[in-house]
Amino acid sequence: MGKFQVISHPLIQHKLSILRRTSTSTKDFRELVNEIAMLMGYEVLRDLPLEDVEIETPITKTVQKQIAGKKLAIVPILRAGVGMVDGLLSLVPAAKVGHIGMYRDEETLQPVEYLVKLPEDIDQRHIFVVDPMLATGGSAILAVDSLKKRGASNIKFVALVSAPEGVKALQDAHPDIDIYTAALDEKLNEKGYIVPGLGDAGDRLFGTK
């Protein structure tokens, strides 16, 4: 069973509180999503494998640690997931970036996939799927399905705000993946939005309605 972790660092919780506010501007919202993703990255990347490497300091030769293989991929679920990419890339700039495009049918609440663009060697990479919201879990499940169909097996899902229903759905569908979130909220409302949530992350990131 994959692990589920709420990353409750004080800085993350403080920034998340500002992010939720209706009064937060598009500019500030965008910056906060980026900052929170970067802060979460410290914990999300904790389990990366290390290997020994011989280096030379100004004083002597020594054996130190580096990330093994460096085969990482960040895969945002479009469009809102794009807002989290730069925060993680600032920590692992050599990571490749794939894209999975989906939209949610407003009547059925089911995700519809319209784009999959991934590195050719995605099956060899440690993958971090990012989306600010884990609501019903439908988009997350479909994204992981797409990755597994292409041979991927080492997958983590990273969200800013999650609903219990979405977490359970993703765990039931893919019990092997790890899930990280900055907040576990109360529930979904009748329209499938997280309560208290932060509204439509995509609209707030890009200033659309």
Swiss-Prot record:
Biological processes, Gene Ontology terms: UMP salvage; uracil salvage
Keywords: Allosteric enzyme, Glycosyltransferase, GTP-binding, Magnesium, Nucleotide-binding, Transferase
Top EC class, one word: transferase
InterPro entries referenced in this protein's UniProt entry, alphabetically: PRibTrfase_dom, PRTase-like, Upp_B, UPRTase/APRTase, Ura_phspho_trans
Cited Pfam families: UPRTase (PF14681)
Catalytic activity of the protein: UMP + diphosphate = 5-phospho-alpha-D-ribose 1-diphosphate + uracil
Cofactor note: Binds 1 Mg(2+) ion per subunit. The magnesium is bound as Mg-PRPP.
Pathway it works in: Pyrimidine metabolism; UMP biosynthesis via salvage pathway; UMP from uracil: step 1/1
Source organism superkingdom: Bacteria
The protein's Enzyme Commission number: 2.4.2.9
SUPFAM superfamilies named in the record: PRTase-like
Annotated binding of 5-phospho-alpha-D-ribose 1-diphosphate, by residue: 79, 104, 131-139, 200
Cofactor: Mg(2+)
GTP-binding found in the keyword field: yes
Coiled coil ranges: none
Regulation: Allosterically activated by GTP.
Residues annotated to bind uracil: 194, 199-201
Keyword Aminoacyl-tRNA synthetase found: no
A GO term for molecular function: uracil phosphoribosyltransferase activity
Protein family membership: Belongs to the UPRTase family.
PANTHER family: ADENINE PHOSPHORIBOSYLTRANSFERASE, URACIL PHOSPHORIBOSYLTRANSFERASE, CHLOROPLASTIC
Function: Catalyzes the conversion of uracil and 5-phospho-alpha-D-ribose 1-diphosphate (PRPP) to UMP and diphosphate.
Name the record gives this protein: Uracil phosphoribosyltransferase
Lineage: Bacteria, Bacillati, Bacillota, Bacilli, Lactobacillales
Gene encoding the protein: upp
